[in-house]
């Protein structure tokens, strides 16, 4: 197998973001779709991480660039080829998703750990950004891989997590 000559994109980034919804069917071969679900709260916590001023910008930038690199590499054939040891995967696509999930959960933990940097406004803004991602996914993605009901349930869970953070913040 040789290195791909032409760069191709397997799917759009919003199609990929829709994989964060609860109940999405795990992908094993079709369409190279990565299995990204690592909790509905992660969308909220990722935006809280971004907004939290108690987390140094020098720590945020490389970590968020790594998140972006992972996200792009799931959808790009050349990066996917490199991630799979210079072979195209046979069977389970995007085998590096466990590293991506670990990174996201680590960032989410840091956002919660630095809870003093999560003002009520920032929690509400992070909630709105997370819900905006879901609305964009609903509007612009292929609804065969994720149903409106799954998106709605994910949005309700994010609302619940935001309310828990607001309640915890008040104490």
Question: Residue ranges of each PLM-predicted region?
Answer:
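Contiguous transmembrane helix-bundle modules in multi-pass membrane proteins
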Residues: 64-78, 87-171
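Periplasmic/ER-lumenal interhelical loops and adjacent helix-loop junctions
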Residues: 1-62, 69-70, 76-84, 93-98, ...
């Amino acid at each position: 197998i040789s290195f791909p000559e032409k760069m191709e994109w397997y799917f759009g980034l919003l199609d990929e973001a829709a994989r964060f919804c609860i109940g999405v069917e795990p992908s094993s071969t079709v369409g190279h779709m990565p299995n990204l679900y690592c909790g509905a709260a992660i969308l909220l916590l990722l935006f809280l991480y971004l907004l939290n001023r108690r987390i140094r910008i020098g720590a945020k930038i490389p970590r968020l660039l790594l998140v972006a690199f992972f996200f792009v590499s799931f959808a790009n054939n050349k990066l996917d080829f490199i991630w799979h040891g210079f072979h195209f995967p046979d069977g389970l696509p995007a085998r590096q998703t466990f590293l991506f999930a670990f990174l996201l959960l680590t960032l989410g933990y840091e956002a919660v750990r630095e809870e003093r940097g999560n003002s009520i406004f920032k929690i509400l803004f992070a909630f709105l950004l997370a819900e905006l991602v879901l609305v964009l996914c609903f509007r612009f993605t292929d609804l065969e891989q994720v149903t409106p009901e799954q998106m709605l349930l994910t949005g309700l869970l994010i609302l619940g997590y935001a309310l828990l953070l607001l309640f915890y913040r008040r104490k």
